[in-house]
Amino acid sequence: MAAAAGRSIVFVTGNAKKLEEVVQILGDKFPCKLVAKKIDLPEYQGEPDEISIQKCREAAKQIQGPVIVEDTCLCFNALGGLPGPYIKWFLEKIKPEGLHRMLEGFEDKSAIALCTFAYCNGNPDDTVLLFRGKTLGQIVLPRGPRDFGWDPCFQPDGFQQTYAELPKEVKNTISHRYRALKEMSDYFIQNGTKV
């Protein structure tokens, strides 16, 4: 778990794999203790930043304390950024193979994996802080383990393996989630108790 010292922040997730990855990436330098909690949040629609802010404000209302929420997008350049923030629903219905099939008629198979962590100090009326990370890649035929979303069909630029095929130690130093968490961790370390 991220550092036990410092205050606790609720990380809103019911996804054990996501929590495991976040804790592994943050390591022991993160100055707050993350406490995972699953809560029901509305499925907002809109642009990624808008969705993250709305989710974070609603989570802060429900938790009545400091919260972090995460939103992930997978944006296909050939489709103008879709499925974007709706990737969860696409994946649920058509699986990784269907994501690849969506681009069959397009030469451009490039995609952007985007992760946004949103933090609220507990007062939903205060400013929500956003921390973003993105990784460029290609949508490929699924390869590797099928236990973590669309990882089997996203091959980051500069690699021959998909996220699913990469060792966790490698993925967790290049992924969109890593980049967003690094930005968030740096901010918390720098600002300490002022956050």
UniProtKB/Swiss-Prot annotation:
Major enzyme class: hydrolase
Co-factor binding comment: Binds 1 divalent metal cation per subunit; can use either Mg(2+) or Mn(2+).
GO cellular component, one term: cytoplasm
GO BP terms: deoxyribonucleoside triphosphate catabolic process; nucleoside triphosphate catabolic process; nucleotide metabolic process
Keywords, comma-separated and alphabetical: Cytoplasm, Hydrolase, Magnesium, Manganese, Metal-binding, Nucleotide metabolism, Nucleotide-binding
Domain of life where this protein originates: Eukaryota
Principal location class: cytoplasm
GO molecular function annotations of the record: dITP diphosphatase activity; ITP diphosphatase activity; metal ion binding; nucleoside triphosphate diphosphatase activity; nucleotide binding; XTP diphosphatase activity
Record field: catalytic activity: ITP + H2O = IMP + diphosphate + H(+); dITP + H2O = dIMP + diphosphate + H(+); XTP + H2O = XMP + diphosphate + H(+); N(6)-hydroxy-dATP + H2O = N(6)-hydroxy-dAMP + diphosphate + H(+)
InterPro entries for the chain: ITPase, ITPase-like_fam, RdgB/HAM1
Binding residues for Mg(2+): E43
Subcellular location: Cytoplasm
CC cofactor: Mg(2+); Mn(2+)
Entry binding sites for ITP: 13-18, 55, 71-72, 88, 148-151, 171, 176-177
Record-annotated membrane-spanning stretches: none
E.C. number: 3.6.1.66
Pfam families from the UniProt entry: Ham1p_like (PF01725)
Function recorded in the entry: Pyrophosphatase that hydrolyzes the non-canonical purine nucleotides inosine triphosphate (ITP), deoxyinosine triphosphate (dITP) as well as 2'-deoxy-N-6-hydroxylaminopurine triphosphate (dHAPTP) and xanthosine 5'-triphosphate (XTP) to their respective monophosphate derivatives. The enzyme does not distinguish between the deoxy- and ribose forms. Probably excludes non-canonical purines from RNA and DNA precursor pools, thus preventing their incorporation into RNA and DNA and avoiding chromosomal lesions.
HAMAP family: HAM1_NTPase
Family: Belongs to the HAM1 NTPase family.
Subunit structure: Homodimer.
Protein's name according to its UniProt entry: Inosine triphosphate pyrophosphatase
Species the sequence originates in: Xenopus laevis (African clawed frog)
UniProt gene name: itpa
